[in-house]
Amino acid sequence: MRELYKNTPAGLCGNEDCGQMSAWYVFSAMGFYPVCPGTDEYILGAPLFKKATLHFENGKNLVITASDNSDTNRYVDEMRVNGTVYTKNYLKHNELLQGGTIDFKMTDRPNMQRGTQESDLPYSFSKDEKVK
């Protein structure tokens, strides 16, 4: 994201299809993105910023922090939602609209133990026994 997107006339990679590339960038920079349209899940990534605040129409705010984020600390070691450890690899739309805090603890190595339970997997990665 730091290499392909810049604040210049040619700062977007590819074609800006009706704002989709910009929307992808904004969501991804916050650390999550709606990968599977039609679901209420946002898949986790790694935030670009150390802090971002979303102000919702309902008057609530969502503060997203990744204070130890850097070019080398680009992996999520731990995540807390409203102070509670959060192991899922997705966030739900209604949870975001409630406001509160999302704190990413970033590290220079992937945490291979985080988010490995079946309940931590998002819809788009779930196993469907009907599909063969």
How should each PLM-predicted stretch be described?
Residues 1-132:
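Non-catalytic C-terminal accessory modules of carbohydrate-active enzymes
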